[in-house]
Amino acid sequence: MYPTSAPIEHALLIAVDWRSPARGADRAESGAKRPLWSIEDALEELARLAETAGIEVVGAVTQKMSRPEPGSYVGRGKLTEIRELKDDLGYDLVIADEELTPNQQRGLEEALGVKVLDRTALILDIFAQRAQTREGRLQVEVALLEYRLPRMTRMWTHLSRQTGGSGSGGGGGAAGTGGGVGLRGPGETQIEIDRRRARDRIATLKTDLRKVHDQRELYRERRRGHEVPIVAIVGYTNAGKSTLLNALTDADKLAEDKLFATLDPTTRRVRLPSGRDILVTDTVGFINNLPTTLVAAFRSTLEEINEADIVLHVLDITHANAAEQSQATLQVLDELGVSDRPTITALNKIDLFDDGVVPAELAKDLELPDDFLPISAETQVGFDALLARIELILDRELVPVSVSVPYAQNALVDLFRREGRVEGVDYNEYGTAISGQLPPRLLARFRPYITAKSKHPQALLEPA
């Protein structure tokens, strides 16, 4: 009988603890970024990532150092300790909590005789498993190849063996290619051929991605033509974003309790209490130290956030590292240039508190904005307040305006009623005269029909 699935890998997690404040100066000199997380929290998240990738974690080893060893990540004594644990724990895979240099990865594999992955490779592997759309798969392959390119060494087997799928071999090291440690791959000439093939493949993929991006931009243009406000749900992975979108739209799609359950953006229509429609988009979850290759590769997908009128930041208030998760999310939003967008901070899973109220001390510790909203995507507690807040923000942006719309342009009258606030209507021989308020994004559509009664300067401005 043939096996129907790949054998489960057993991983030992390793991490260098340079989180001590006393070592901050050393880290600053080396240009490294001090993490916000404790070593225990970082390893707990790494274990969750491994579990999501289908890997069983059998143990963890840490070492306090001012900086990782350049050739082996951990020190010589710790390396011996890790090697001696192999028989006791039965691990066949080692996962490092940070992104390893090619020298560190190679040094660990040669010393331990097992495949070695780092945090970046693990996340890339999860993305490779979960990408559903053509765009998502293209983005993941670009990120994988760009990660692997500098790691092609004398022990690198032929690229054609790598492109059929990643499995858990995202690290790209010798032991992860199927050749095994000690089995030399091609010579230097073949390595150069492989590198050129990888660069050519990346160029081809990026060309394909540009075409997909152009198609997405056409979709966005059509969506803009309908002038429906957009709310982008953002937040740390597994914060409950997909559950929230499903609850808002009465969808019965299963929201998995796994990291990175959503990679491809999902957009659905939601009706506000006033009858106004909005589009709500669920985006890929963020994570601490999200690999730069993934941020770059998924930039076109993350552009959905740039299109949003409102950013809805969902935070798992019950998580022990809620503050760190919030900061990681805000950092990515800042990198995307949307940190100044109107933002609602929704504290999810409030139903897990006995009285359904966020403790004042916790809110203070998290340095939350004063106008945060407690909600439960599971029980829909706080949804009325959430929808009202969205409506309030949309109304706050409205511009007073008076227009006279020809009868032949009645679709604009419907648009005004649907997306604006009508305060007065009069019908005359020229058309429909409306006074009220409109969102700024609609002013260009109505500018030919704006009358002198419009006192607000933004309404009277000529287009640039």
Residue ranges of model-derived segments:
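Flexible beta-alpha connector loops of hexameric P-loop NTPases
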Residues: 31-38, 67-72, 130-135, 190, ...
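N-terminal accessory targeting/assembly segments
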Residues: 1-125, 454-464
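Long, well-ordered amphipathic alpha-helical subdomains in the mid-to-C-terminal portions
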Residues: 392-442
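Conserved G1/Walker A P-loop phosphate-binding module
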Residues: 2-11, 22, 165-296, 302-310
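Conserved C-terminal guanine-recognition region of P-loop GTPase G domains, centered on the G4
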Residues: 35-54, 83-88, 97-114, 274-277, ...
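Canonical P-loop GTPase G-domain recognition
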Residues: 111-164, 168, 179, 340-344, ...
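Conserved beta-strand segments of the P-loop GTPase G domain that flank and frequently precede/overlap
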Residues: 13-17, 60-63, 95-97, 313-316, ...
